[in-house]
């Protein structure tokens, strides 16, 4: 339905300013259009975005045809933990199949619902008894018990608005022992010997090596909070931690001060792990074998164990 020009609010109308506010005008007519444009360009432009979407649909269809995973022994020490959801389930499927094919033996898998898994969880459960899914309701109940919002307001706020923090909270809060968390978009091409050896006998934290240091916060502040000098290039695409040793009060305090002094940042989770690992020796995945930014040549003809 068309409206007459007189019915359309004009920016010169004082009532328009009062009802919408200058801040909302700035958001609507500048920040949102500019943000959308920059997002499109970061993804290579509209044609690249369409091609990416076409390939995503092909990958989803291919994931539906993948066979079940071989059943592991119930007490197998080889267990991977992944956060996943509607946008990532097919990546998770290929990640797990590539691991089993490269490692040559079954793996137990624990998946953590990012809040969007309900409609696609059956696609992952059909891979058989190797898969255990932690539903959102179960995760929230555990967090409410071990990280109640009145005692951990910053961690719980970040849990709502910053899903990456869930790779720490959802996997480790209220649970003991070593766990290896990996990103859903990883693929394995050679036997992941380093990771298998760690899983069989974990005795220190594990992390990958980044292609570019990305902590999101200044080193002096992070060093002071950690009480130690951070190691360079810590990457959490592979992250092995012992939930029994995590001090959640300390993590809450770190988050609060980092955000109060230098605002929120996409790399907060990586910053926290870099601070945790600064105080102890770590198992560091060999950068040449576990790549975080493979070249086009490597992508087309993989020689590394993972990327």
Model-predicted segments: where are they?
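A short acidic, often aromatic-flanked loop/helix-cap motif at beta-alpha or helix-coil junctions
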Residues: 137-146, 214-215, 290-295
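Catalytic core and acceptor-binding pocket of nucleotide-sugar-dependent glycosyltransferases
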Residues: 211-213, 229-307
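GT-A fold catalytic core of metal-dependent nucleotide-sugar glycosyltransferases
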Residues: 163, 167-213
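N-terminal amphipathic/basic-hydrophobic helices that include classical n-h-c signal peptides
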Residues: 1-10
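A short, conserved beta-to-alpha structural element at the edge of catalytic cores
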Residues: 206-227
């Amino acid at each position: 339905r068309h409206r007459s020009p007189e019915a359309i609010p004009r920016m010169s109308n004082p009532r328009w300013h009062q009802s919408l506010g200058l801040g909302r005008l700035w958001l609507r007519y500048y920040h949102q259009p500019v943000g959308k444009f920059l997002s499109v360009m970061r993804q290579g432009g509209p044609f690249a975005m369409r091609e990416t979407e076409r390939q995503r649909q092909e990958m989803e269809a291919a994931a539906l045809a993948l066979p079940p995973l071989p059943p592991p022994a119930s007490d197998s020490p080889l267990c991977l933990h992944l956060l996943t959801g509607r946008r990532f389930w097919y990546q998770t499927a290929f990640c797990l199949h590539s691991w089993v094919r490269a490692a040559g033996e079954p793996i137990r898998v624990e998946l953590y619902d990012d809040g969007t898994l309900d409609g696609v969880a059956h696609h992952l459960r059909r891979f058989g008894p190797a898969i255990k899914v932690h539903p959102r309701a179960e995760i929230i109940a555990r967090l409410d018990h071990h990280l109640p919002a009145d005692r951990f307001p910053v961690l719980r706020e970040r849990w709502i608005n910053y899903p990456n923090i869930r790779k720490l909270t959802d996997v480790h809060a209220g649970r003991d022992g070593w766990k290896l968390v990996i990103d859903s978009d990883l693929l394995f091409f050679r036997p992941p010997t380093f990771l298998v050896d760690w899983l069989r006998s974990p005795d220190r934290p594990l992390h990958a090596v980044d292609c570019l240091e990305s902590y999101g916060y200044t080193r002096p502040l992070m060093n002071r909070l950690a009480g130690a000098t951070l190691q360079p290039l810590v990457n959490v695409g592979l992250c092995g931690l012992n939930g029994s040793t995590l001090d959640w009060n300390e993590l809450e305090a770190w988050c609060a001060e980092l955000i109060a002094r230098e605002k929120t940042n996409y790399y907060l989770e990586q910053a926290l792990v870099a601070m945790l690992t600064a105080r102890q020796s770590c198992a560091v995945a060999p950068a040449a074998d576990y790549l975080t930014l493979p070249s086009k040549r490597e992508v087309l003809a993989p020689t590394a164990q993972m990327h």
